[in-house]
Amino acid sequence: MVVFGEDVQAKIRANNRNWDARAPIHARSRFYGIGDRDPMSWFAPFEWRDLGRLDGREVVHLQCHLGVETMAFALKGARVTGLDFSCVCVREAQRVAREAGLTIDYVHADVYGAVEALGAERFDIVYTGKGALCYLPDLTEWAQTTARLLKPGGFLYLVEFHPLLNALGPIQRPGETRDLVIRRDYLGGRGAVERDSTHTYTDGPALASDTLHYEWSHGVGEVVTALAEAGFSLGRLTETCLLPWQRWPAMVRTQHGWWTMSPSEPRFPLIYGLKASKPTRLK
């Protein structure tokens, strides 16, 4: 397990406290709609194509938060484990699964300690993404950890917000047009970005404390290189102009229930999906 310097460890601890504070608010937000929104609705259509049949397969969802997506794997017949570094998130996820009548094993652990917490070569599929990688300072260690979790022949399925989405500013400044502009780094390499806000991406009350958190930018090239160097065979890469919520006013709802830019706007990637397989035999 990687050991970070004190500066990075302090940032990870701040993130942990921040997500502990967020969890109860998120669990009761209209954004997540727990108890009302179908867990399947959090997935783009191409995800089920790429994931294939899940019945009886061992699936782990890393950085699972409240488990809204984790539940969908259980509904598909998989034997599911969810892992998150926030003990409050894990507690809320356990409650949500219990109320839904689903059997899911939730584990409180950091991603970098996942092998120690869960065991090596245990899973057929590792699933993660949609706001996960930006909280990881080291993708090389993440990719190696993911490879160790998988059985030979298993695969990682990463569905993550495109770095272009994170680089585009969602807020119009005074005197500006409504055109989207680049406000943040697309590429990584300049360290963590500090953010301090009393509100998160959901509706609900303000955070009473622990508003400070840190994010790391990771370009697609950095992700692909980390996985290739960890021994993965890279398969399908999908870019899509879809999002599971309305990020900007110019977005319109699709037939699937997700959101995309209106037809009069340029098309650009908002989410990407990457399937990477662990070889059956190491070379």
Q: Residue ranges of each PLM-predicted region?
A:
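N-terminal, positively charged/glycine-rich alpha-helical extensions of SAM-dependent methyltransferases
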Residues: 1-37
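A short SAM/SAH-binding and catalytic strip from SAM-dependent methyltransferases
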Residues: 124-140
